[in-house]
């Protein structure tokens, strides 16, 4: 298996060629999302279709270079054939007030699975519980509800929160803590057979209007522990998660992501990083290349439910006139065409364009050095 720099078999296109087809966009978000109000991305009008490079600005060059490897692989190399032409997706609810939940859900027509952001800085468990309750009430008892803490809790906070939120019949909890060892401990304490003695049972649970279960079984999903780790397989070897959340860009592209999930042997949900439709297309092709889970108890590298690929609905605009948005709870697997009018409308300021070009140049140099 190749390392974090991308597939060893992928030829690196020359930097001049990459920069010549590059545009930078800055698209406002509809709702502040994990501190982001404007999403910036470098878009390449590549030979095999548009590709995207959009690591968040705070990421260092070593980490960002995997995202560039993904963009260059997607835009300049043939990809694995998809097994289906549509992918089921989930709605994503940012850390908004509970009263805004219906408005957010309306942007995801037909979705029967919802991921709810929790553990937002400056908020507490009462805010999370109100938000998750609003989602459950809006969606009804048959919908799947997931929570995503983005590693925002410590072990005790995670156990406390997830025992409480189990009231709402969670599908799974994504990255409740940052470290692999922490995930192992949280998973152990939320498994059947745990004593159920914790800081949010009895009186504390009643304060929030919840009825915490004695022994909640909450599956644990790993995201950051896969995509931001030097060893993306460590979480699987440690038994720290029940399933993996994989994102094509930070893992170096579709082919490398497929290699990782095959070796990990855990069920998979494919997600995005608040991408434009171009980045979403990469995620859709990854999801469509994975076999579907068949019934309960499915194991191995299979697609395990609705994917977090509907997030273009959280952007005010896009780089295509026909964005990849949920319809009937699914999105068609296709490569969107860039729209010159949208690229102009959302063009980043000149100083941000320069910043992204310099970043691509540095990351390309890292990839080039690694290839030799």
For the regions a language model picked out, list residue spans one by one:
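Flexible C-terminal active-site loop/helix
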Residues: 1-39, 50-54, 76-77, 82, ...
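Glycine-rich, proline-tolerant flexible connector loops at the mouths of alpha/beta enzymes
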Residues: 52-62, 112-129
